[in-house]
C-alpha cells in the first residue's frame, strides 16, 4: 500500500493523515484537509519531512469541463474576465442525508462542503485571490432531520450556514 484515501468525517482528517504519513504512506483526503490553518501547516510540515505527498479534494477542477474552460481562457476565446457571480442555495443536508450531523459541526458547513468546489474552480480559472470580504450567519441554532431513518431528530448547528462573500483576484477580476 503506497497511498491512503481518507474519506472520514472532517474532524478525523488530521489524525488519519498524520498516521498515514508516520507510516510512510502518501495520503489523499476528502475535504477539508484540516480543521484550521495551523493543522494544515502541521500536515504539510510532516509530509515535507517524510518526503511524502498529501492531496485533498476537490480535484473536480481537473475534469473535462474545468479544463475546457481553462483552455478557452488561456486561448483568449472569451476575453478578459472582470466580473462574475456564483450562487449555491439548498434546503440543507438534513433534508436528504441519512446522518447529517457532521455537516453542522465546525469544519463543515456550506463553504467547506460545497462552496469549496466553486472557489477552487474560480482560482483555477482566474488565478490567486488577493482580497476576500465575507459575512456569515446562522438562521437557526437547531435543524430538524427530514430524511430517513432519523426523521424528526434534532441537530445542533455549530457552524455558519449562510455565507456571502466577494473575491478580488490578483488580476483585478471580482466575483
What is each PLM-predicted segment?
Residues 3, 15, 42, 68-71, ...:
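Alpha-helical elements of Rossmann-like donor-binding domains used by nucleotide-donor carbohydrate transfer enzymes
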Residues 12, 25, 32, 55-61, ...:
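Rossmann-like NAD(P)(H) cofactor-binding subdomain of soluble oxidoreductases
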Residues 60-156:
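Predominantly a Rossmann-like dinucleotide-binding segment in NAD(P)-dependent oxidoreductases
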Residues 23-25, 50-52, 170-174:
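A short helix->loop->beta-strand "cap" motif at the edges of active sites that frequently abuts
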Residues 160, 165-172:
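Active-site beta-strand termini and strand-to-loop segments that position acidic
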Residues 24, 51, 79-81, 129, ...:
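A general structural motif
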Residues 1-46:
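Beta-loop-alpha module in the N-terminal Rossmann-like domain of NAD(P)-dependent dehydrogenases
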Residues 42-59, 78-86:
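Rossmann-fold dehydrogenase core element
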Amino acid at each position: 500500500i503506497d497511498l491512503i484515501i481518507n474519506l472520514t468525517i472532517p474532524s478525523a482528517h488530521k489524525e488519519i493523515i498524520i498516521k498515514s504519513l508516520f507510516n510512510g504512506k502518501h495520503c489523499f483526503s476528502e475535504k477539508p484537509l484540516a480543521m484550521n490553518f495551523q493543522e494544515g501547516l502541521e500536515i504539510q510540515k510532516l509530509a515535507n519531512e517524510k518526503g511524502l505527498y498529501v492531496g485533498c479534494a476537490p480535484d473536480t477542477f481537473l475534469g473535462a469541463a474545468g479544463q475546457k474552460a481553462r483552455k478557452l481562457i488561456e486561448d483568449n476565446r472569451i476575453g478578459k474576465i472582470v466580473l462574475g457571480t456564483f450562487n449555491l442555495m439548498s434546503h440543507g443536508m438534513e433534508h436528504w442525508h441519512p446522518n447529517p450531523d457532521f455537516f453542522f459541526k465546525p469544519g463543515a458547513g456550506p463553504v467547506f462542503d460545497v462552496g469549496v468546489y466553486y472557489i477552487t474552480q474560480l482560482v483555477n480559472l482566474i488565478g490567486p485571490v488577493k482580497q476576500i470580504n465575507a459575512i456569515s450567519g446562522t438562521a437557526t441554532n437547531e435543524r430538524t432531520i427530514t430524511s430517513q431513518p432519523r426523521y424528526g431528530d434534532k441537530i445542533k448547528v455549530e457552524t455558519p450556514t449562510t455565507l456571502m462573500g466577494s473575491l478580488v483576484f490578483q488580476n483585478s477580476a471580482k466575483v
